[in-house]
């Protein structure tokens, strides 16, 4: 029987790089991991709280964290010019202060930088967020999946697979539905495949969205 493996972990060191880059003693490792989680949660909560009500869209592709003894460097990769890009200096300063408060580290400076992603809809996190927004607005899940695939094709993705699991359209029995377009060669290590899992809370309960995107071949 085939065993499922996370496509990002499977390709680390070849086509994927680490989202967190730091070294720690084994006894301090769990503490560093919790710190990373806290930083990411704090940034996402801040963006959710301060983004415009009309869009309701975060557009964060990923958050990279690099740590040194005296510095924590956080790079936020965003797809769209949201509030972090527009009121750049003020927004980032406020965000830095918020994150610094969440973990009490006196000896280390925190530096937050913003990087813009070239093709936002080629990023699985942004596509999953788009689908989640559609599902919250009670759009049919099939329609939302097809629209997400169209957007990925416009971003020059070579293949995409979208899967949604849970009580779809409010049905009593939970099920899994998926659509694939193009090639998604999960077993080939040299191909660049991006993946994300995204839970979304709807009026019928929690649904799980998974997206695999085949971007490029090395």
Curated annotation (Swiss-Prot):
One Gene Ontology term of the molecular function aspect: rRNA binding
Gene3D superfamilies: 3.30.300.20, Ribosomal protein S3, C-terminal domain (3.30.1140.32)
Signal peptide residue numbers: none
Coiled-coil intervals, chain numbering: none
InterPro entries: KH_dom-like_a/b, KH_sf_prok-type, Ribosomal_S3_C_sf, Ribosomal_uS3_bac-typ, Ribosomal_uS3_C, Ribosomal_uS3_CS
GO biological process entries: translation
One Gene Ontology cellular component annotation held by this UniProt entry: cytosolic small ribosomal subunit
The protein's name: Small ribosomal subunit protein uS3c
Family under the similarity heading: Belongs to the universal ribosomal protein uS3 family.
Domain KH type-2 residue range list: 47-118
PANTHER family for the chain: 30S/40S RIBOSOMAL PROTEIN S3 (PTHR11760), SMALL RIBOSOMAL SUBUNIT PROTEIN US3C (PTHR11760:SF19)
The organism of origin for this protein: Nymphaea alba (White water-lily)
Keywords: Chloroplast, Plastid, Ribonucleoprotein, Ribosomal protein, RNA-binding, rRNA-binding
Protein's cellular compartments: Plastid, Chloroplast
Claim: RNA-binding is one of the keywords in the record: yes
Pfam families xrefs: Ribosomal_S3_C
Chief location of this protein within or outside the cell: plastid
The protein's assembly and partners: Part of the 30S ribosomal subunit.
